[in-house]
Amino acid sequence: MGVTKKPDLNDPVLRAKLAKGMGHNYYGEPAWPNDLLYIFPVVILGTIACNVGLAVLEPSMIGEPADPFATPLEILPEWYFFPVFQILRTVPNKLLGVLLMVSVPAGLLTVPFLENVNKFQNPFRRPVATTVFLIGTVVALWLGIGATLPIDKSLTLGLFQIDSI
């Protein structure tokens, strides 16, 4: 490969550049030509070879074969629409369901304005954005899992029983 040059940390010029956050060109292995000419093509060709090999050796069907005379018992949307489907399925009023779906992007648009005071990038130092993300993720997973269950078990995920009056 290439020649790796060890840095001389006693060099005052290098120490001054390292103190300013510079000086990375003085040591290490160069990206050109080692990475760009030798490593990247091997990785790219290896990835292509693995994909072609898997496609040839184990071809998979795209979905089930179509049968126009057999309707499935329950028609479900694609997996990324499960939370929205669950909202529409459980909310009795359709207008309220549409308003709930519109409130999700509207709420996400307000988060930068709530967090505008905080300039940190670390999520542990941005509590509002982190809390909104965690609560949104839990609710989306809860609704997504509930959409795959029958309607009577969808809100509780079958974990506990709610007695209706």
Curated annotation (Swiss-Prot):
InterPro entries: Cyt_b/b6_C (IPR005798), Cyt_b/b6_C_sf (IPR036150), Cyt_b6/f_cplx_suIV (IPR005870), Cytochrome_b_C_euk/bac (IPR048260). The chain crosses the membrane at residues 36-56, 95-115, 131-151. The keyword Cell membrane does not apply. SUPFAM superfamilies: a domain/subunit of cytochrome bc1 complex (Ubiquinol-cytochrome c reductase). One of its GO terms (cellular component) is chloroplast thylakoid membrane. GO terms for molecular function: electron transporter, transferring electrons within cytochrome b6/f complex of photosystem II activity; electron transporter, transferring electrons within the cyclic electron transport pathway of photosynthesis activity; oxidoreductase activity. GO terms for biological process: photosynthetic electron transport chain. Keywords: Chloroplast, Electron transport, Membrane, Photosynthesis, Plastid, Thylakoid, Transmembrane, Transmembrane helix, Transport. It is found in: Plastid, Chloroplast thylakoid membrane. It comes from the Eukaryota. It is a multi-pass membrane protein. PANTHER family: CYTOCHROME B (PTHR19271:SF40). Belongs to the cytochrome b family. PetD subfamily. The 4 large subunits of the cytochrome b6-f complex are cytochrome b6, subunit IV (17 kDa polypeptide, petD), cytochrome f and the Rieske protein, while the 4 small subunits are petG, petL, petM and petN. The complex functions as a dimer. HAMAP family: Cytb6_f_subIV. Component of the cytochrome b6-f complex, which mediates electron transfer between photosystem II (PSII) and photosystem I (PSI), cyclic electron flow around PSI, and state transitions. This is Cytochrome b6-f complex subunit 4. It comes from Populus alba. The gene is petD.
